[in-house]
Design a protein with these regions (language model features):
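An acidic/histidine-cluster motif and surrounding catalytic segment
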Residues: 1-94, 98-205
Length: 205
């Protein structure tokens, strides 16, 4: 039997109710919730934040990043690092405003078991709403898993393996775009991204 998976939940200290809600969702799905202290970008001066490259951001997006975007990005760095520090082979990363769909709870144990037997992936997006340039890989517990050649946006529900989290962190600085944009760049380059055809986790509750 596989060990109970951990879900690393990105959460600001000022939002305990959101953490409680996320914990209840994950516990009901037999996932151990682990809080990751979110980075509050509102407290930083981007002009003095060494990891951020404003010139590169302007070249890439035509504008500077917002403090909130930088905060979300650093929070995803922290979550990937926390997963690696756990020593686990596979881990979930969630933002704290998630809601699990019924299919998540029924299918995810088999999805995890299926992923554990493969090395041809780095990250799975469980919450994408728009998929572009994909090819079918397998149907697991009734859920279609796709190769996301153009990794989808939204990063509120991810599954990492160790190779993927390491690859993301290695490429993650300087910061010049939102976290989901960087995920798209890293995973499209490697072609090691997967996604579920239906979003199993929604956000914004």
């Amino acid at each position: 039997m596989l060990p109970r998976p951990k879900g690393f939940v990105i959460n600001l200290a000022a939002s305990p109710q959101r953490l409680d809600s996320a914990k209840a969702e994950l516990t009901s799905a037999q996932i151990e919730p682990i809080r990751v202290d979110a980075f509050d970008g509102r407290e930083i001066d981007l002009a003095q934040f060494a990891a951020y490259d404003d010139d590169k951001a302007r070249r890439f997006m035509g504008r500077s990043m917002t403090q909130g975007e930088v905060g979300c990005y650093v929070s995803h760095q922290r979550a990937a690092a926390a997963f690696l520090e756990s020593g686990d082979e596979i881990g979930f990363v969630f933002e704290d405003d998630i809601a699990l769909q019924p299919e998540f709870k029924t299918a995810i144990p088999q999805v995890i078991e299926w992923l554990c037997g493969r090395e041809d992936w780095h990250c799975v997006n469980l919450g994408a709403t728009r998929l572009k340039i994909t090819s079918p890989v397998a149907k697991v517990a009734g859920i279609e898993v796709l190769r996301a050649h153009y990794f989808p946006m939204l990063a509120h529900a991810l599954i990492w393996n160790r190779a993927g989290a390491n690859a993301f962190l290695a490429a993650s600085e300087p910061i010049f775009c939102p976290a989901d944009n960087m995920l798209r760049q890293v995973l499209t380059r490697s072609d090691m991204g997967l996604a579920t055809a239906q979003n199993l986790v929604t956000a914004g509750r």
